[in-house]
């Protein structure tokens, strides 16, 4: 079974602080996770860190993280960091 979550907006330090409880819950779910990134126009190191945190937690439990609808700056940054190689798209 897979769970879906739509990221509500940009993934910067301020928004990641607000989203932390939700992201902790998602990372603890015992199922694959798909994150819809269609509303994310900007991501900084806090957002990247949150995605890596979720990815590692899911991977350690045998589950996968998939990012959907990556575009613009988030796609460019995650591609540059080679995170799109480890996260299914």
Feature map (PLM): residue ranges:
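Short beta-strand/loop segment at the start of cytosolic alpha/beta domains
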Residues: 1-6, 18
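Amphipathic alpha-helical interaction surfaces in cytosolic regulatory modules
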Residues: 13-87
């Amino acid at each position: 079974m897979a769970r879906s979550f739509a990221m509500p907006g940009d993934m910067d330090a301020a928004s990641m602080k607000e989203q932390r409880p939700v992201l902790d819950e998602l990372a603890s779910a015992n199922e694959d996770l798909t994150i819809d990134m269609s509303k994310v126009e900007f991501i900084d190191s806090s957002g990247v860190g949150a995605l890596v945190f979720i990815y590692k937690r899911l991977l350690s439990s045998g589950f996968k993280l998939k990012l959907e609808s990556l575009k613009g700056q988030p796609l460019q940054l995650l591609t540059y960091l080679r995170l799109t190689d480890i996260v299914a798209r």
